[in-house]
Amino acid sequence: QEIVELNSVAKSYGANILIAYNRRFYESTLALKELIEIDGGATSCIFEFTEWSHIIGPLKKGPGVKESWFLANSSHIADLAFHICGYPKDFSAWHGGSLNWHNASERFCGSGITEKDIMFSYHADWSAPGRWGVEVLTRKNRYILKPLEKLQVVRIGSVTVENIEIDDENDLKYKPGIYNQIKAFLECEDTMFCLIEEQLKHIDIYNKIAGYD
């Protein structure tokens, strides 16, 4: 409801509101997108958005924040995967369990196909070990963002995980992604951002993944 009202106010003032998903601007993300294009495009994608319940549970947050934690936090990783491979045009989602700070769901899995005809799947278990990660597959390579700040590759015909060197000086000097994000904002390069009207469409996808009514 808040995003609907915010979008309405923005339109009434002729303003653009950009969602600050900084993972889109990581040097690892930018390098990955270039490599995917060189390979001829992605064929499939896997992502994980496991959260550390033992850390998040005790946190003091405002009303409703932890109860909608997927929207507040985990959507960063879903946005990254879908930014790279396209947003779902058809998918199925399953969720189960509950936590004392997140009643809607505890475990998540799903799969589908994006608007770019790329098959995807995801998984998360908020009561088990894990971390955020994205894997994008092409006909030549499997690219791994895990952690998201680093880019690794498994080449076809191999099982060896190799590190890909990237120029991540600004991501190390500042909070990752922030330098490129602010630069794009100041130079009015909005194409890399998620616009609020786009996010309004994505909310239904995120609610389905998270199990929110």
Predicted feature residues:
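Active-site loop of classical SDR/Rossmann-like NAD(P)-dependent oxidoreductases
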Residues: 145, 168-183, 194-197
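Contiguous beta-strand/loop segments that form the cofactor/metal-binding neighborhood of enzyme cores
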Residues: 72, 76-150, 182-189
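C-terminal helix-rich "cap/oligomerization" subdomain common to oxidoreductases
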Residues: 12, 183-213
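Short aromatic-enriched loop/helix-cap "lid" or pocket-rim segments at secondary-structure transitions
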Residues: 3, 29-31, 56-60, 103-106, ...
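Predominantly a Rossmann-like dinucleotide-binding segment in NAD(P)-dependent oxidoreductases
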Residues: 23-92
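Alpha-helical elements of Rossmann-like donor-binding domains used by nucleotide-donor carbohydrate transfer enzymes
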Residues: 5, 27, 31-34, 80, ...
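Beta-strand-loop-alpha-helix segment that lines the small-molecule cofactor/substrate pocket
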Residues: 1-21
